[in-house]
Amino acid sequence: QRFASAFMTLVPQTPTKRVTVAELTRYLHVDRKTFYNYFDNIDSLMIWIYRAYLAKMLEDALFDDWEKEKLSADAFDPYPELPFYARRREKGLLCQGPYFKAMAYHWENHRRYYSIVFSSSCYLDLFDYIIALFLPPFREDVRYYLDGRQMPDIVVDFIAEYHVMGVFGRLRYHFTQTNKFIMQDEIDSFWNYAHTAMKESVECCFEAVERRGIARLLGQGGQTVRFRGYHRERFSECGDGRLS
C-alpha cells in the first residue's frame, strides 16, 4: 500500500514523464529489491492499485449478498485472486448501480492521478486493461438476460462491447476531458443505466436474430465486403450531361 500511495502522489507531480521504479523507491527510502518483492514493474503496480481498490470495495457490507466474481486461475492477469465484479439479481434484472457508483468514487477521489494515467502515453494503457477485464463478465450479463435463449456469439460480443464501452468510456471522458464532478445528484438514479439498457438491447437483438436470422442481421450471408471507395465510372457524365 505504501508503494501505491507514493506512486499516486508522484504521478501528478511529474505529469509529462513516467515515474520510474528508481524514483519511487528513492521517494520511499527503500531499495529497488523491496519493490520487486511485490511487483514486476510499474504497470503491475498500476493494475494492483485499481484491482486492490475493487477488492476492498467489495468487502463493504453493502455487497455482502452480492455474487462476487474473480478471474479464473489460468487467466492472463497478475492478480486473478482479487474479486473485481459483483452482481445483484432482482426479479430478472441486474441491479448494478451501487457497484458502479462505489467504483466511480475511487476515480473521483483520485481525479488528478486517473486523468493523467488515462491520457498519458507514458504508462500502461489502463483503459484497455479495464475493458479487457470487464468484457467477460459483461458477456455473462448478456447471457443472463438471454435466460437460456440462443444468440450467436458475435451478437453477444457486440452487446457486451457496446455497454462496457458506454460505462467506462463515459468515466474516462469525464476524467480526461471535463472538470465536472461525476457524482451529480441529478444522475444518481441512472448508475444502473448500462444494465437497464443492456436488457433492452438483448431483447431487440434477439428479436432481430429470431425474425431474420444472423446472416440477414449482419447484412446477407457471406463475407463482409469492405468499402473500397466509389468507382470512377459511377460518377461519369451521362450523354445528357447528368452524372450516372
Question: Locations of the language-model features?
Answer:
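Alpha-helical residues within the helix-turn-helix
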Residues: 26
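Amphipathic alpha-helical linker/stalk segments
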Residues: 13, 50-95, 114-116
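Amphipathic alpha-helical packing segments from all-alpha helical-bundle domains
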Residues: 98-109, 121-147, 157-168
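Short, residue-level hotspots on alpha-helical faces of the histone-fold
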Residues: 5, 48, 52, 128, ...
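Secondary-structure edge/capping motif, primarily at the C-terminal ends of alpha-helices
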Residues: 68, 111-117, 145-148, 174-178
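C-terminal peripheral helix-coil segments that are non-catalytic and often amphipathic
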Residues: 139, 143, 164-244
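A short secondary-structure junction motif
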Residues: 10, 56-60, 64, 110, ...
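An amphipathic alpha-helix adjacent to DNA-recognition modules
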Residues: 1-8, 12, 17-21, 29, ...
